Amino acid sequence: MTKNLLVELGLEELPAYVVTPSEKQLGEKMAAFLKGKRLSFEAIQTFSTPRRLAVRVTGLSDKQSDLTEDFKGPAKKIALDSDGNFTKAAQGFVRGKGLTVEDIEFREIKGEEYVYVTKEEIGQAVEAIVPGIVDVLKSLTFPVSMHWAGNSFEYIRPVHTLTVLLDEQEFDLDFLDIKGSRVSRGHRFLGKETKIQSALSYEEDLRKQFVIADPCEREQMIVDQIKEIEAKHDVRIEIDADLLNEVLNLVEYPTAFMGSFDAKYLEVPEEVLVTSMKEHQRYFVVRDQDGKLLPNFISVRNGNAERLKNVIKGNEKVLVARLEDGEFFWREDQKLVISDLVEKLNNVTFHEKIGSLREHMIRTGQITVLLAEKADLSVDETVDLARAAAIYKFDLLTGMVGEFDELQGIMGEKYTLLAGETPAVAAAIREHYMPTSAEGELPESKVGAVLAIADKLDTILSFFSVGLIPSGSNDPYALRRATQGVVRILDAFGWHIAMDELIDSLYALKFDSLTYENKAEVMDFIKARVDKMMGSTPKDIKEAVLAGSNFVVADMLEAASALVEVSKEEDFKPSVESLSRAFNLAEKAEGVATVDSALFENDQEKALAEAVETLVLSGPASQQLKQLFALSPVIDAFFENTMVMAEDQAVRQNRLAILSQLTKKAAKFACFNQINTK
């Protein structure tokens, strides 16, 4: 016989960004708890609103499965003394299992007998296990937590109710300072307290109190309501996925509506209007069928349609205040002079240990000079890059960015165009912030890409130089994201810029404001980001590529992919083993690896030396790998017919020199002795 279990935790309003992860975490931990308690079930469904987290388990077995476990103890020679009596070792072993020496039996394993005991545990009724659910609730983790009412414990928000039902049976469990009951809370304004009748009636009991407990249902309600407004007004409404997820976690009973604002505000840049609506007011943007922004917005109310006109007016009033600010800053910022703002950046701190933003820009400008040549920019692109690097942070001192910091770079582009700068300079100022997330959009222009790399590199090197190095999950200055951005941009543009050589060049630069330090740590940090970009590539292949001598990001990623692609082929294992043996022996070479053909003693070493001399890795990574694997028979023949570590020192070093030259070329692809072929 199966049962249905419901657990609901009623809290004060949760931050929207916490709701969905917490709901998922509750479901996962409940499933793990039940499996750990040997309770089978058919399905788990989770629920969440801003004021509750809940989980329902259906088809839950009414008792634990019985458990039979065998435990291996000490060897028989240790378990018995010379008189055949059980020793203290044997007695202690069985006592620890809650058994006696009478339960001991001996089993033979690989010719030797050992103590074994079998312990049987009869499964308990599910009712006896339910109280342990409190530990599941206590185990939930949150990005922030708080104390309340003088209590010593912490939780994401104060807890008001706990409901635990097994079908209709109520459990009055104690959790924090709350005693469980079947009472739950309805909508804050439209509903009231209600009793949940059973685990299966949960959604309907709450629906009567204007609470839609299932977030998927709330999401669909919002989407359907927006689609209805679209059809009614013949408009297009942008349903941004992130905004939708946030809004559904702000409401328990959603009602979407359309509001409007004066069309005069459409003269302000669209990005300002969209930011005001989406980021600050959580409104959806409305466009006509041609994609043109309209003076309307969509909001979602936490409630029904009663007095909706008053709600619309209130939302319009709040938005207009934001738009007034945007219009004012747009008008006033155009009176500013870019060069004056750049000069004022001398008084804006980048970081107290590093210096001003202006000093950061100067260092970035010097880095762009190095990168421009390596990225093979044209003369015009180089000129645009120099101009962009000289002014690219100026918009941080505009009123608009001061009010709407999400628009940094975006407003820089617009103001530079108004000031007569070239489109390339303007675009680079916008693009230098890219990417803004792990999977964020990358710069499209070469000028913007180089400026983005230079800005991020100085940021990384500057913070490392003053000892502000990320550790563990702690990365307050987003240096991992900056490094990931550098790596992604280099890969996307296919620039064959060796990172080790570039970093060496940067450390050779001289600045009045700062001296770069901790180069080794920087290199390890960059390699860790390349490692991350390799994704699910096997660890040994990652290590082989990262240990290689080629630190061109695009080449490294391509090499890793090529190795993974051929790793299941028949010749992979023997080819890698041949190269690996060469790598291991080459480490014994001394001095400069010079090969003297006069010291050859057989045709096989001559053949390998000639093959290595003519080896030039070229083309895509898959082709280079074929070139290396083609040497496998020649390498094998060399090892089969040649004693590398010959007694004659000159002959030995000559043979090691052949292998050293081979591995030097192969290491541009990967260090093959790092690959596991077992």
Curated annotation (Swiss-Prot):
GO terms for cellular component: cytosol. Its EC number is 6.1.1.14. It comes from the Bacteria. Pfam families: DALR_1 (PF05746), tRNA_synt_2f (PF02092). The keyword Transmembrane does not apply. GO terms for molecular function: arginine-tRNA ligase activity; ATP binding; glycine-tRNA ligase activity. Its main location: cytoplasm. GO terms for biological process: arginyl-tRNA aminoacylation; glycyl-tRNA aminoacylation. Keywords: Aminoacyl-tRNA synthetase, ATP-binding, Cytoplasm, Ligase, Nucleotide-binding, Protein biosynthesis. It is found in: Cytoplasm. InterPro entries: DALR_anticod-bd, Gly-tRNA-synth_bsu, Gly-tRNA-synth_heterodimer. It catalyses: tRNA(Gly) + glycine + ATP = glycyl-tRNA(Gly) + AMP + diphosphate. It is an enzyme of class 6 (ligase). NCBIfam families: glyS. Belongs to the class-II aminoacyl-tRNA synthetase family. Tetramer of two alpha and two beta subunits. This is Glycine--tRNA ligase beta subunit. The lineage of its organism: Bacteria, Bacillati, Bacillota, Bacilli, Lactobacillales. The gene is glyS.
